[in-house]
């Protein structure tokens, strides 16, 4: 176990423990990794001076290693509990550093499939903690993710209730990046509710703000996808195809195979609906489509052949 030691010795002990963690990971000693990570995470610094940059880095590293291990092993409950447990343990961390740790773990957990109800509960837990600790920016980040989760669970009114307050607050704080993300979720919710005018208005707001800041490729692909869906709803399939193609290229460049395949399906749909079945068949038979052949593409092929005939 880690013992209490004066100042720099505390950070040195944590650093040595992290080295042991890395070695245990290489040797696939799961039990040892969990034990060592928990020791580093749970031990308290003797004084505020002991929690220096090296000590914080060691605790942060141990947290990430443990979280990734839980994710790889499918220990979702343990991953969720880890996020709850570190809140009081890391309360003396620099605010920006703690926010980074919470965001990183939360984003990792968001990738878990089939556990949306638990993720909603976790979101509410973290939001309540943020309110108590006056961490408004972190709260708004988690609220954006929560709204997206509620959208996926088809709890559209609950999502809109959060988004209406959130977008108003984000506009006042001029957090443009998060405003883009929240308004994109809003557009998806209205689209699911078949309220095309509001879905389009939210998307227009997204693009207006996005034009003034740098948008990461993954978010840009999501914006393009939403643009394609709305264009398709308006039966402008030529424009829809161009957006779906941009989405496809974006996901393909990021090696997001499943998402690229999803957008490829919509590319084919647009060509077929635009009465260009020959183009759809050419895409299906092209070298670029080999990675994305599945039952959905096969179904599109049958439709294209039927239309051609």
Predicted regions and their residues:
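Extended alpha-helical scaffold regions
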Residues: 1-309
